From Swiss-Prot:
The modification Phosphoserine is found at residues 463, 489, 503, 558, 746, 829, 892, 897, 922, 1056, 1064, 1120, 1124, 1273, 1325, 1340, 1416, 1441, 1456, 1461, 1528, 1540, 1547, 1594, 1736. Extensively phosphorylated on serine and threonine residues in a p38 MAPK-dependent manner which reduces interaction with DLC1 and increases interaction with tyrosine-phosphorylated proteins including BCAR1/p130cas and PTK2/FAK. The majority of the phosphorylated Ser/Thr residues are immediately adjacent to a proline residue. Also phosphorylated on tyrosine residues. This is Tensin-1. Residues 129-301 form the Phosphatase tensin-type domain. GO terms for cellular component: cell surface; cytoplasm; cytoskeleton; focal adhesion. A zinc finger (Phorbol-ester/DAG-type) spans 20-67. GO terms for molecular function: actin binding; phosphoprotein phosphatase activity; zinc ion binding. Pfam families: C1_1, PTB, PTEN_C2, SH2. Its EC number is 3.1.3.-. Residues 1097-1110, 1155-1173 have a biased composition (Basic and acidic residues). GO terms for biological process: cell-substrate junction assembly; fibroblast migration. Binds to actin filaments and interacts with phosphotyrosine-containing proteins. Interacts with STARD8. Interacts with protein phosphatase PPP1CA. Interacts (via N-terminus) with Rho GTPase-activating protein DLC1; the interaction is decreased by phosphorylation of TNS1. Interacts with tyrosine-phosphorylated proteins BCAR1/p130Cas and PTK2/FAK; the interactions are increased by phosphorylation of TNS1. Glycans are attached at residue 1315.
């Protein structure tokens, strides 16, 4: 037994010889606890000059501890024998010194003398004598007084490790009580969460670096916790190489330096010494690189590069000697956000250190975010591979197209003698996928051979999937406790077991290298792909072999869950078993029992049996490119680009080894950990370990594929709440809204998990939010799904119990804190990656540590979370509501997912009530809440007052007002039963006060509070809108609601709007006394700065291809910066961070009003907007997350809707006012409101004044993201939101008159009635809300693109409205908002369904059908569209019965409209032009689940008449006709018509006026592929709505808007292809242009313009041939946080919308060759006039043709070609065992050749066969048929023969089977043979 001094933590050498202390009186500047009474020494106290022991002067006499000079201890030999630690640090033997023994001292050899440092501060005796690498002991070091590093060597054996863990836990509890928060930086372990009350999971693979945004999240979380309470300490736990701790310490050192204060200088110095002394020698180059990135981004020395980079070549200068005879057999694996995106062939290189080898990637591989490139050596004739080198970097810090890493910069290689001393690796990038000219010299010589057989499991095996596999830690032993601090004695007795020193756990040693289960995580859908869709391609790598289940019987998935999983996964090509893993966080988190993964450098032997992708990988080289359109990346992401990017490093077994086969067994843990998506895919369960479902809670952990790491935070309270946390009873529902939390969670989130702390995951922001929500949601859902839904509180309890934790009886406000802090899920989708990058920027922005004044402010921790404070909920979540439950309040309506849609959720009533109106003091709550409860959200409050009057009834009063029944639009639902009202208390999961005790959670909570508060304030009634942040936010789509789970109103950010629409307004909760003003996290200055720098989010949601994807997925628009309560560190706002893309906030989003209503407004805005900071997002998410679960019906309660009336006065223009003439508006104009007329879309002269708005003025835009169509201004939102928290939701028409009336704002500013885009509830449908665009200017084309939400409005449930479940459609699964996967959105007659994309989300539902009963106008933003959105491949049919106008933004989609029902395009009702996007029948960007929407190329002509000589008039080759002919999505731009009834001055202008397209027919062909090949025909005219009688105040009637002529319909052609654009422009005058949606970069736009002469380089290259095509130049318009800009043109500003960009360039060319000439007529009309019938092959070829087919196989033919090759290939394929699995691919034929795109990335991303390589194409000569696995008639087989890349003689035959009956194989073959090949021959 050993004694340890609790005060100084030193181990006395001789307890028997006490020495007298030498006390001196000292005034303590820093808070320090008394060593005797443990109370804080506030002013004067005594401190010993020798040992630094401190106490109160009055306690001095009680001191009994001997004075032990530190020096004596430094000399004390470490008693290694007593140290049970045999833990071997992976590669680094981190442990040192005896157990908890202050090995600190050892480490702190530099220990500061007492004179300098009164406290035992980091006794850093970095004694070099003890090499950390060899130490096998626990190493506990006080890096600073409040930061403790606990490290164990990876080799420590489990028994010793567990023993040490217990001892450390005892020591921490005895010394710090409950004031420590443990950050687990290594894989998750159940025992850690059992031993420690508060744990945040930020783990990542050992020896790797975390995602940049994860670093931000950790710093933010640490700062929040440390600032929350002077007693709080942070414990960094790591098992493995201490480099992980070093990264965090160094990053926090830089982070804290931003707002540095003199009193912290010593701490920073201590951190610096610790890092330099202990970490640098053992760290990895990439870890140092990331610390440098982080430091540079914070300081501004590194500018954020948001451009996507395409990697073309990886050149190794110097050949490593891995073979006995020299040379090596390298192959590359490239991971984006820890998701594999590319695997090269295996190069066989013989050479020496002077030789170079180039690995070429064609086409270029798109990389964005956190990138990991590993080069392996495949051993010759051995199933093993060695790591040659590994390098991690982040594209945001790459500014050169050539990057060189020397040996010292390469992980693994830097200390490997086999790698040449002067060797280096060079990366060659470009800004496009096209081959780089002039790089031919990089070709390898003939001696280098390449084997493209990447299907070998060894090659495919990824080593990051089991990083967090569930492990059984066997913590059955009781912690050998003590007597000690617990019994008041000064010393704690720690029982120590003798352990064999140095015995390393056999774990690693024995761990079979060959785990039966290869890690597949990498292959899981890569959540991180840009597209936000997980890339199945990444999956390709994964093996199907299931991993053994965990020992604990995993709970089996319920049939419903299985179905849901299957449905969701079906698009990914993943089997459920793989998914299974995802479900279980335990698995994910637990590591193989075997122990830590072996160092990645280890050799991996891959089981041969693993088959990739079901085998049948084409031998041909695959390019696994994560395209922006990766299809469903749900698997998690996120971390947006980095989300996944951050993938929280899941290295499960380090690369070195496979996860132990045991891993599954490992966890017996009863408490499932929140599922963290694996680092890689995070969520996708790989067969291996993940797969097991946690038996424990009996719930399956919901799969959160995209869960970003940070999301995990949400899982923070993984364990039961601990008493400390104040939590309202309702907490139980922690954000179960799957949507809210999980991206694509279609699975029930059965596993209870604590809300993760704000760890920022894929998209940190999102992740955080998700995290918070996720835990809540998961818990709730799990409970709900698994059990009858008990009341929320009860559910919560149940959850906890299921976890094995019993929760103290609910206390309304103070729940015990959950033991777990938020943890974040692991994977991120591409989107997430993007988001994460964006988030990263935001994060960095947000990172600014809070200034001393408001320690919490910085992150604005969750208000109420602190025990003393009212629960989070009580604080306004975003400060918005003062009410006791900020979280709950806001969306009180939230219904646990379990409830059926219509069922009200039992809401625990009281928490809210229990809390006094004024919220209790909460550290986080900086802003006092308004005094009166009512104050909370009154439309009338001054800020809002302007609009308040608008409402007929001033329900605004906080009272439990009933929704004004009178409001026509609001048909309020019958008042919700009290419980619903009360539901308020039952916080939506998001609202649930997370039991995040202090900590980030608080911050999060605060944000949530702010968000929620506002929402709440709006009306607690409203069911929490699900803040779907785009449901598929980072790649994760909000998980679709399970059938069982009621769709909750989503608060989604309109896909295009970039803001969340409340899917349904939440009824105001009577209780929500008033929402208090939101806590302001951001100082007004910062807010202003942010406002001025909307860089945070693309103003036009679609604009940013990558970011957009994330954002779309997130569905969040930037929210206003945290309210002023917190000041950002000085200068931070000015730092480039904002430039970093730290999700700067759209100024418009930021409500600067500091006061009451204004605050509320802010809150509302914030709610609707995307959180600006990750914390905020977390908060928001927390707030919103739960909402998600609420049934949408709940949201119906119109009360909120009524609020609509209070539109915020719009500064911008009068509603009716004519459109402000567009003046070039630079994006910089902070206020461009998304929709605000001139603001966002077009520059407007008035817009400038917006910029000037005073903080008090609500930014009109705040409600809108620039470009966001529907968001009402915050005021408006707030007003109407009073009824609904989300701005949009609230906008339901509350007043009879839809037009926003102008109210003079209290400020006295008269706001012109700007039509605020708001969600209007159509009269009669309480819930449905239509988001109208208030701006006069056409929104940027992108607006409509975002997610579609299904709107299910049961007759009774007004609120259904559409939940925009799916984030961007592309993202992967489209979540169903409907309760059923296929939820069809049906609105009963009379209840208009105003879904933004009702249909869309329908699409998102798989095959959702939207049916509108006759008479019920469906105002879906894209009702049909998403329906029509072929994109989703799902075939959703939207049928509007006659009589029911369907106002879908893209009604036409694929859905068919019954003849009688007018289909109003997006906002048809409002008259005006539809935005270009609106006009697009299908959401171009929404592309289907596959995530990739191919260019809208015409289908293959079936009739011979199409071919030369027989051209049919109908099919004129003109690009225009071609597009339309095929029914391709090319938008038919109807003439703009004004509704006859639309001439009302008050009407809200809607861009979309009557541009609506009616889809006259459903997709004709089965090609509903995202590629857009589907044939959808749209009528070009809109029905005259005037014929349909609609209430006078209906949106249609109000639709009169006068715009300056909108020419966008002439120049914005979203669906045309590049070739069509060229054809349209080649005969035009210079300056003519067309903007289309980029088909290569999702979310970006292509500008094609005619110039007078081609560039000189082109002239030289093409001296012969037709130069007319070269006169049409192409530019990429990329979207970013600040809007849109020309890519690659540094002197180009950012513009708030495409319109702004176009008008500016029509005035001055800037970087363009000449000015743009704005057309006054449609070029397609001209081309039709000028072009005769196409009868030449060249015309047809220019047009191209495409459709979807089944790719069967590719067979090597050597030199064989012709029909014999086709026949032979088919024979071999059919005879193969097993028969290859067919994959749907997009088959496009053009003048360039044949391009195959695997929309789901199952086999490859895209393959192109140039025209000159294709030699033959024909049907099977033997007429054999292909039997489809899914059934159906046998399909004809056909194929083409093409020369293999790089060979002049060898051919390969590529076989296909017809898929679409309307596109028979014969038509395809005819086109290829008669058109393409014949054209090639003529040349």
């Amino acid at each position: 037994m050993t004694w340890i001094c609790l005060s100084c933590m030193l181990w006395p050498e001789d307890l028997e010889a006490p020495k007298t202390h030498h006390f001196k009186v000292k005034t303590f500047k820093k808070v320090k606890p008394c060593g005797i009474c443990r109370q804080v020494i506030t002013r004067e106290g005594c401190t010993c000059k020798v040992c630094s022991f401190s106490c109160h002067r009055k306690c001095q006499a009680k001191v009994a501890a001997p004075c032990i000079p530190p020096s004596s201890h430094e000399l004390v030999p470490v008693n290694t024998e007593t140290a049970p630690k045999n833990v071997v640090d992976t590669g680094e033997a981190a442990s040192r010194g005896g157990n908890t023994r202050k090995s600190l001292e050892e480490d702190s050899s530099t220990r500061v003398t007492p004179s300098v440092q009164p406290h035992p501060q980091p006794i850093r005796n970095m004694s070099t004598s003890r090499t950390t690498e060899d130490s096998c002991e626990l190493d506990l070091v006080y890096v600073t007084e409040r930061i403790i590093a606990v490290s164990f060597p990876s080799t420590a054996n489990e028994e010793n490790f567990r023993s040490n863990l217990r001892e450390v836990a005892q020591m921490l509890k005895s010394k710090h009580g409950g004031n420590y928060l443990l950050f687990n930086l290594s894989e998750r372990r159940p025992d850690i969460t059992k031993l420690h009350a508060k744990v945040l999971e930020f783990g990542w693979p050992d020896l790797h670096t975390p995602a940049l945004e994860k670093i931000c999240s950790v710093c933010k979380a640490m700062d929040t916790w440390l600032n929350a309470d002077p007693h709080n300490v942070v414990v960094l736990h790591n098992k493995g190489n201490r480099g992980r701790i070093g990264v965090v310490i160094a990053a926090y050192m830089h982070y804290s330096n931003i707002s540095a204060s003199a009193d912290q200088a010593l701490d920073r110095f201590a951190m610096k010494r610790f890092y330099e002394d202990k970490i640098v020698p053992i760290g990895q180059p990439s870890q140092r690189r990331y610390v440098h990135y982080f430091s540079g981004l914070l300081s501004g020395s590194i500018k954020m590069n948001n451009k996507p980079l395409f990697l073309h070549h990886v050149i190794m200068h110097g050949i490593p000697n891995f073979e006995s005879k020299g040379g090596c057999r390298p192959f590359l694996r490239i991971y984006q956000a820890m998701q594999p995106v590319y695997t090269s062939g295996i190069y066989n290189v013989q050479g020496d250190s002077q030789t170079s080898i180039c690995i070429t990637i064609e086409p270029g591989l798109l990389l964005k975010g956190d990138i990991l490139l590993k080069c392996y050596h495949k051993k010759f004739r051995s199933p093993a591979r060695d790591v040659i080198f590994r390098v991690q970097f982040h594209t945001c810090a790459i500014h050169d197209l050539g990057v060189v890493f020397g040996k010292e910069d390469l992980d693994d290689a830097f200390k490997d003698d086999r790698f040449p001393e002067y060797g280096k690796v060079e990366f060659v990038f470009s800004y496009g996928p096209e081959k780089i000219q002039g790089m031919e010299h990089l070709e390898n010589g003939p001696s280098v051979s390449v084997d493209y057989n990447t299907s070998d499991p060894l090659i495919r095996w990824d080593s990051y999937d089991n990083f967090n596999g569930h492990r059984d830690d066997g913590m059955e032993e009781v912690v050998g406790h003590t007597q000690g601090p617990l019994d008041g004695s000064l010393y704690a007795k720690v029982k120590k077991k003798d352990s064999l020193h140095g015995s390393t756990g056999a774990v690693n040693a024995t761990r079979p290298v060959l785990s039966a289960t290869p890690n597949h995580v990498e292959h899981t859908l890569s959540v991180s792909s840009d597209s936000g869709n997980s890339t199945a391609s990444t999956k390709t790598d994964k093996t199907d072999e299931p991993a053994p289940g965990p020992a604990s019987a995993p709970a089996a998935l319920s049939p419903e869950e299985k179905r849901e999983l299957d449905r969701l996964l079906s698009g990914f090509g993943l089997e459920r078993e793989k998914q299974g893993a995802m479900y279980h966080p335990q698995h994910l988190r637990s590591r193989p029992v075997g122990g830590p993964a072996a160092p990645s450098s280890g050799r991996h032997i891959v089981p041969a049996q693993v088959h990739v992708n079901g085998g049948a990988l084409a031998s041909e080289r695959e390019t696994d490119i994560l395209d922006d359109e990766l299809p469903n990346q749900d698997g998690h992401s996120v971390g947006s680009m980095g989300t996944l990017s951050s993938l929280d490093g899941v290295t499960n077994t380090s690369e070195g080894g496979y996860p132990e086969a045991l891993s599954p067994l490992t966890n017996g843990l009863d408490k499932p950990y929140p599922m963290e998506p694996m680092v890689n895919g995070g969520g996708y369960p790989y067969e291996s370990a993940s797969r097991a479902v946690s038996a424990q809670a009996g719930h399956t952990a919901p799969m959160r594929p995209s869960y970003s790491t940070q999301e995990g935070l949400a899982g923070y309270q993984r364990e039961g709440p601990h008493p400390a946390w104040p939590q309202s009873a309702t907490t139980s529902h922690y954000g179960h809204d799957p949507n809210g939390m999980f991206r694509s969670q279609s699975f029930p989130e059965t596993e209870p998990q604590l809300p993760p702390a704000p760890a920022r995951g894929g998209s940190s922001r999102e992740a955080v939010q998700r995290g918070l929500n996720s835990w809540q949601q998961q818990q709730q859902q799990q409970q709900q799904q698994q059990q009858p839904r008990p009341p929320p509180r009860q559910q919560e309890r149940v959850h906890l119990e299921s976890l094995g934790l019993s929760r103290p009886s609910p206390q309304p406000l103070a729940e015990p804190p959950m033991s777990g802090l938020p943890e974040f899920p692991r994977a991120a989708s591409q989107q997430e990656i993007e988001q994460s990058i964006e988030a990263l920027n935001m994060l960095m922005l947000d990172l600014e540590p809070a200034t001393a004044g408001a320690p919490l402010h910085k992150s604005q921790s969750v208000p109420g979370a602190w025990p003393g404070a009212s629960p989070l909920s009580s604080q306004p979540f975003s400060g918005s509501s003062c009410q006791s439950h900020p979280l709950t309040q806001s969306r009180s309506g939230y219904i646990p997912s379990g409830h059926s849609l219509g069922t009200p959720e039992p809401a625990p009533r009281a928490p809210l009530e229990s809390v006094p109106t004024g919220r209790p003091y909460s550290p986080y709550d900086y802003q006092p809440c308004p005094t009166g409860p009512n104050q909370s959200y009154h439309p009338k409050s001054p800020a809002t007052s302007s609009s308040s009057s608008f409402l007929p009834t001033t329900q605004s009063s906080v009272g439990p007002q009933q929704p004004p029944a009178s409001l026509p639009g609001l048909t309020t639902q019958p008042q919700l039963p009290p419980k619903e009202v009360t539901s308020d208390p039952s916080r939506t999961p998001e609202e649930e006060p997370l039991n995040l005790e202090g900590l980030v959670a608080h911050r999060v909570a605060a944000y949530n509070a702010r968000l929620q508060g506002t929402g709440r304030r709006v009306s607690s009634w409203h069911p929490p809108l699900h803040r779907l942040r785009s449901s598929s936010l980072s790649g994760v789509q909000a998980r679709e609601k399970q059938p069982a789970e009621p769709p909750a109103p989503l608060r989604k950010r309109a896909a295009s709007d970039g803001q969340y629409e409340n899917q349904s307004p939440e009824p105001t909760s009577p209780r929500s006394p008033g929402v208090r003003s939101p806590v302001q996290c951001v100082s007004p200055e910062l807010a202003l700065t942010i406002a001025l720098n909307p860089g945070g989010r693309p103003k036009e949601p679609h604009l940013h291809s990558y970011k957009e994807a994330f954002e779309e997925m997130e569905g969040t628009s930037p929210t206003s910066p945290p309210p002023s309560g917190v000041r950002s560190p000085p200068g931070l706002a000015k730092t480039p961070l904002s430039a970093l893309g730290l999700k700067p906030h759209n100024p418009a989003d930021i409500l600067l009003h500091p006061t009451g209503e204004e605050d509320e407004r802010k809150v509302l805005t914030e709610l609707s907007e995307e959180p600006r900071s990750y914390v905020e997002s977390v908060v928001r998410t927390a707030v919103a997350g739960p909402r998600t679960q609420e049934p949408e019906p709940k949201s119906f309660s119109a009360p909120g809707a009524q609020a609509y009336g209070h539109e915020t006065p719009l500064r911008i223009g009068t509603l009716g006012g004519s459109f402000v003439s567009p003046s070039p508006l630079s994006t910089s104009s902070p206020i461009l409101s998304a929709d605000s007329t001139s603001v966002g879309s077009f520059p407007s002269g008035e817009s400038s004044d917006q910029g000037a708005r005073t903080p008090t003025q609500p930014l009109l835009d705040s409600g809108f993201r620039s470009g966001s169509l529907g968001q009402p201004s915050p005021l408006a939102q707030r007003n109407y939101q009073s009824s609904s928290p989300l701005p949009t939701a609230g906008s339901s028409y509350s007043s009879p008159d839809y037009s926003l009336q102008q109210f003079s704002s209290p400020e006295g500013q008269a706001r012109s009635q700007f039509s605020v885009a708001g969600v209007h509830t159509v009269p009669g449908s309480p819930q449905a809300r239509h988001r109208t665009v208030g701006t006069n200017t056409p929104p940027s084309p992108g607006f409509g693109r975002r997610a579609v939400n299904p709107s299910l409005a049961a007759p009774s449930s007004p609120s259904l409205s559409h939940r925009q479940v799916m984030g961007p459609l592309g993202t992967g699964f489209h979540g169903n908002t409907g309760s059923s996967p296929q939820s069809s959105a049906a609105t009963t007659p009379g209840s208009p369904s105003l879904g933004r994309h009702p249909g869309a989300h329908q699409v998102s539902n798989l095959h959702g059908n939207v049916v509108t009963a006759p008479g019920s106008p469906s105002l879906g933003r894209h009702p049909g569209a998403h329906q029509g959105t072929l994109a989703s491949n799902l075939h959703s049919n939207a049928v509007a019965s006659p009589g029911s106008p369907s106002l879908g933004r893209h009604l036409g989609g694929s859905g068919s409209v019954v003849p009688g029902s007018p289909s109003l395009d997006r906002h048809v009702p409002y008259g005006g032009y539809s935005t270009p996007e609106d006009r697009r029948p299908t959401l171009s960007r929404q592309s289907s689940a596959s995530g990739y929407q191919a260019p809208s190329t015409p289908s293959f002509p079936v009739s011979p008449a199409y071919y030369p000589g027989l051209s049919s008039p109908a099919t004129s080759p003109s690009p225009d006709s071609a597009a339309f002919r095929q029914g391709s999505p090319t938008p038919a731009l109807p003439e703009k018509r004004r509704m006859s009834m639309g001439d009302r001055a008050g009407s809200l202008p809607n861009y979309a006026t009557v541009n609506g397209k009616v889809s006259s027919s459903p997709v004709a062909s089965g090609m509903s592929s995202p590629s857009g090949g589907s044939t959808v025909s749209f009528s070009h005219t809109l029905p005259d709505f005037s014929k349909y009688s609609m209430p006078d105040n209906s949106p249609e009637t109000r639709a009169k808007v006068k715009f300056v002529q909108d020419t966008s319909k002439y120049w914005y052609k979203p669906e045309i292809s590049r070739e069509q654009a060229i054809a349209l422009l080649k005969d035009q005058e210079p300056g003519a242009f067309i903007i289309r949606d980029s088909h290569s970069f999702r979310g970006a736009y292509g500008l094609a313009m005619k110039v007078s002469s081609p560039p000189p380089t082109i002239m030289q290259q093409n001296k012969k041939g037709d130069m007319t095509h070269e006169l049409v130049r192409h530019f990429l318009i990329e979207t970013g946080p600040r809007g849109v800009k020309l890519k690659g043109c540094p002197n180009e500003p950012n513009f708030g919308s495409l319109s702004a960009l176009v008008y500016q360039h029509s005035i001055i060319p800037l970087a363009l060759p000449c000015k743009l000439v704005i057309p006054n007529r449609d070029p397609t009309d001209e081309s039709k006039d000028s072009s005769g019938p196409a009868n030449s092959t060249s015309d047809l070829l220019k047009q191209g043709a495409a459709c979807n087919v089944l790719f069967v196989n590719s067979v090597d033919m050597e030199s064989l070609t012709g029909p014999q090759a086709i026949s032979k290939a088919i024979s071999e394929t059919l005879a193969a065992d097993p028969t290859p699995a067919a994959t749907i691919v997009h088959f496009k034929v053009s003048a360039q050749g044949i391009t195959l795109t695997d929309n789901q990335r199952k086999l490859f991303f895209r393959r192109h066969y140039p025209l000159n390589t294709v030699t033959f194409c024909d049907l099977d000569p033997q007429e054999r048929k292909w039997t489809k696995t899914e059934g159906g008639a046998p399909a004809k087989l056909f194929g083409f023969v093409a020369r293999k890349q790089g060979s002049a003689t060898d051919n390969a035959c590529h076989l296909f089977a017809e898929l679409d009956p309307n596109q028979p194989a014969s038509a395809i073959v005819s086109f290829v043979s008669k058109v393409m090949l014949s054209a090639g021959q003529k040349r």
